[in-house]
Amino acid sequence: MAFDTHHVKKRNFSNSIDLPRKRISNFTSKNMKEVKRSPKQLAAYISRTVAQAVKSPEKLRKVLYHRKLVRRSFPNPCYKTKQSPKSGGCDMANKENELACAGHLPENLRHDSRTFVINTSDSGSSQTESPSSKYSGFFSEVSQDHETMAQVLFSRNLRLNVALTFWRKRSISELVAYLVRIEDLGVVVDCLPVLTNSLQEEKQYISLGCCVDLLPLVKSLLQSRFEEYVIVGLNWLQAVIKRWWSELSSTSEIISDGNIKILKQQLSGLWEQESHLTLVPGYTGNIAKDVDAYLLQLH
């Protein structure tokens, strides 16, 4: 009786132990079977599969990628299986698969693949192109006259500094002589508005002789194709006429200052050539009309 009890307990104890069972899915077993195929069988099988899928070239990459996944062996989650070392036969099978797939590719697909490689190299070369080479033509065009412009600006700055030195010393006669000597209309346009303001404020340090000496330069400004130059010249003429209008409009035959007679003659001759400025619309024409109204009274 005791023996039976002991036997029952032993049997129950053995039954209570739940030994883990090796679980292999259908997908894993199928893959393991495919791994056992010989290289020639595997190449023939893949060739048939690719021949069916090559009708739609877009699926070719998916087929190759799927076959690569199939060759993997998935280990069981419960047991540690010993992985077989990589053999040269498997690599040879891969090479045979690629050659077999390439042999079944249609002609247009092969041509497209070669074209894709060429386009890829072209796009790579365009992406690696440096900005300096891309805009080299633009930079060369911009910098074509850069040295000449730099020399002009340097010379202009130097001459303006000299004129500023004369102005600070209140040596107006030396300043006018310097402007007449260099004959640089750009410097004259920068300096003449300062003299115009002094004439409008009736400063005593600007003499009538200085204005007479500046008339040839003002004539060049009125004949310029730049409207800014013309406006500067007209403003100066207007300021000079208003500053010495009492002497210019005098009917006395005896003129105490000979420069008044010279100025009157030069103004009349100058305006005979530049009276067309009254036809210019806008601010320029308005100043020209005002100067013309003063000079008509002198005849």
Swiss-Prot record:
InterPro entries: Katanin_C-terminal, KATNBL1. Regulates microtubule-severing activity of KATNAL1 in a concentration-dependent manner in vitro. Interacts with KATNA1 and KATNAL1; these interactions are competed by KATNB1 which has a higher affinity for them. The keyword Acyltransferase does not apply. One of its GO terms (biological process) is positive regulation of cytoskeleton organization. The modification Phosphoserine is found at S56. It is found in: Nucleus; Cytoplasm, Cytoskeleton, Spindle pole. Its main location: nucleus. Coiled coil: none annotated. It comes from the Eukaryota. It comes from Mus musculus. One of its GO terms (molecular function) is microtubule binding. The keyword Cytoplasm applies. This is KATNB1-like protein 1.
